[in-house]
Swiss-Prot record:
<dbReference type="InterPro" id="IPR011034">
    <property type="entry name" value="Formyl_transferase-like_C_sf"/>
</dbReference>
<dbReference type="GO" id="GO:0004479">
    <property type="term" value="F:methionyl-tRNA formyltransferase activity"/>
</dbReference>
<dbReference type="InterPro" id="IPR002376">
    <property type="entry name" value="Formyl_transf_N"/>
</dbReference>
<keyword id="KW-0648">Protein biosynthesis</keyword>
<protein>
    <recommendedName>
        <fullName>Methionyl-tRNA formyltransferase</fullName>
        <ecNumber>2.1.2.9</ecNumber>
    </recommendedName>
</protein>
<dbReference type="InterPro" id="IPR005793">
    <property type="entry name" value="Formyl_trans_C"/>
</dbReference>
<dbReference type="InterPro" id="IPR005794">
    <property type="entry name" value="Fmt"/>
</dbReference>
<dbReference type="InterPro" id="IPR036477">
    <property type="entry name" value="Formyl_transf_N_sf"/>
</dbReference>
<comment type="similarity">
    <text>Belongs to the Fmt family.</text>
</comment>
<keyword id="KW-0808">Transferase</keyword>
<dbReference type="InterPro" id="IPR041711">
    <property type="entry name" value="Met-tRNA-FMT_N"/>
</dbReference>
<comment type="function">
    <text>Attaches a formyl group to the free amino group of methionyl-tRNA(fMet). The formyl group appears to play a dual role in the initiator identity of N-formylmethionyl-tRNA by promoting its recognition by IF2 and preventing the misappropriation of this tRNA by the elongation apparatus.</text>
</comment>
<dbReference type="GO" id="GO:0005829">
    <property type="term" value="C:cytosol"/>
</dbReference>
<dbReference type="Pfam" id="PF00551">
    <property type="entry name" value="Formyl_trans_N"/>
</dbReference>
<dbReference type="InterPro" id="IPR044135">
    <property type="entry name" value="Met-tRNA-FMT_C"/>
</dbReference>
<dbReference type="Pfam" id="PF02911">
    <property type="entry name" value="Formyl_trans_C"/>
</dbReference>
<feature type="binding site">
    <location>
        <begin position="107"/>
        <end position="110"/>
    </location>
    <ligand>
        <name>(6S)-5,6,7,8-tetrahydrofolate</name>
    </ligand>
</feature>
């Protein structure tokens, strides 16, 4: 089968490698190179780099216009596989592929349609999430489900960990979905009454409000790693939080919210919140390395009693 692959994210790299080993990948659609670093030199993403190493045609259009459509048609693809590409496809584009178009989405659809399902699942304190391969339609993430698996979120620490799991465990579902398509199996229709949505995460979401519960703050910190990275201020300096846990307790209720009340080498840096104790495990000063709580504390022994804002 001649497959056209669309992705702009490293999460799809393992799928691209495996699908290229077993099928004829005739083209890869990915985002344009972006300026990076002080010199603003153009940075090649991992998807493009892998495709070029395999001598696969790479397309990086800003707009999916008629010229792009004609170019894709000239590759004579039979099926499109999409995994975190970043743009919405019009029907004219979807119609290029006679076998159809399938998409890998890291949630248990119809839950969390949209661009941030992994982060949103952690943020909301969900106990399970999953991976879905769906047949693509014009409406975002609303196509028939061809393959699906689930996992327990408690097995992971942060969004980074789940990204890695999804990256390594999506290919078998793709094969299951392809086999169903080729047999004429239309899959399972999503129940639109159970559909929920998630949105893009930006810098405006990253500030920690210590008046919230320790449970909610812990979820935010772990959800927002690697992006947009939750943060707060300490001594007029911005501190980035990379990983956290929490303790449900009524102790320290007389302490100021946001106060660093103790350091426990077996737990972490303990911070008073609106409900319970936030246990900070990994953090970072702007421009410095990410440190575990022990290393951070040993370099900042005057932390106890200070207040995050």
């Amino acid at each position: 089968m001649r497959i056209f692959f669309a992705s702009s994210d490293v999460i799809a790299l393992e799928v691209l490698k495996k699908i290229s080993d077993q099928y004829d990948v005739v083209g890869v659609l990915t985002a344009p190179d972006k300026p990076s670093g002080r010199g603003l030199s153009l940075k090649v993403n991992d998807i493009k780099r892998e495709a070029l190493s395999r001598k696969i045609t790479v397309l990086q259009p800003v707009v999916l216009d008629a010229d792009v459509i004609n170019l894709v048609k000239s590759l004579e693809p039979e099926l499109m596989l999409v995994f975190s590409y970043g743009k919405i496809f019009k029907q004219e584009f979807l119609d290029i592929f006679p076998v159809g178009c399938i998409n890998i989405h890291p949630s248990l659809l119809p839950k969390y349609r949209g661009p941030s399902p992994i982060q949103t699942a952690i943020l909301n304190g969900d106990s399970i999430s999953g991976i879905t391969v769906q047949k693509m339609t014009l409406e975002m993430d609303s196509g028939n489900i061809l393959a699906q698996s689930q996992f327990e979120i408690k097995s992971f620490n942060t969004s980074v960990d789940i990204f890695e799991y999804v990256s390594l465990n999506s290919f078998d579902l793709v094969i299951e979905a392809l086999n169903k398509l080729l047999k004429g199996d239309i899959g399972i229709v999503q129940d639109k009454n159970n559909a929920t949505y998630c949105s893009f995460l930006g810098k405006e979401h990253r500030t920690i409000d210590f008046k919230l519960s320790a449970f909610d703050i812990k979820n935010k910190i772990n959800a927002y790693n690697p992006w947009p990275l939750a943060r707060a201020r300490l001594d007029n300096n911005e501190i980035i939080f990379h990983r956290a846990d929490f303790i449900s307790t009524n102790d320290y209720d007389d302490q100021v919210i946001g106060k660093i009340i103790a350091f426990d080498p077996s737990k972490g840096l303990l911070v008073k919140t609106g409900d319970g104790i936030l246990v900070v495990l990994e953090l970072q000063r702007i421009g410095k390395k990410v440190l575990d709580c022990v290393s951070f504390y040993h370099g900042n022994r005057d932390l106890i009693g200070k207040v995050f804002s």
